[in-house]
């Protein structure tokens, strides 16, 4: 069975975590909120592996990554929603995951993120297939709103299925109409 890692998989990406678990992956989910993790596990107890660690603590994160890979095999897919207070997380992933085989990194970004700048900063090695997902907003009946968790998960699943280099969920324009 393939192995996926989801950072941010108990909140807005919970449905994506469950989808991965129903589509051939054992899914290691990093989360700090015990209640959200329990709700996620209840949706698929066999397919979800809880990883209770604060991803900003990269020393503990690296230890957890080593342990889960030892138990569940190498990680082939990473879905990462990382806040700006975790700038060392992606370098930690790159150094902690396989150096010998290819793996995919789907990096979820906020609507205001500069994807070109982020891609330069991330600087992934050639064995890491890097994809960017940018979360936008919705325009409806002349008003705008942020995306729902369902819309986010649906868009992220489309991005994973299509392996699109840069994928926008919702819209980013007109920028002045964002909520």
Residues covered by each model-derived region:
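A short acidic, often aromatic-flanked loop/helix-cap motif at beta-alpha or helix-coil junctions
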Residues: 56-60, 113, 137-145, 174-177
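Hydrophobic anchor at the start of a short beta-strand
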Residues: 27, 48, 130
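C-terminal helical subdomain
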Residues: 141-179
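Canonical Rossmann dinucleotide-binding motif of NAD(H)/NADP(H)-dependent dehydrogenases/reductases
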Residues: 1-28
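Rossmann-fold cofactor-recognition segment
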Residues: 41-61, 80-83
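Conserved glycine-rich Rossmann-like NAD(P)H-binding loop of the short-chain dehydrogenase/reductase
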Residues: 24-39
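Rossmann-like short-chain dehydrogenase/reductase
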Residues: 36, 59, 65-129, 134
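Active-site capping/gating segments
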Residues: 126-148
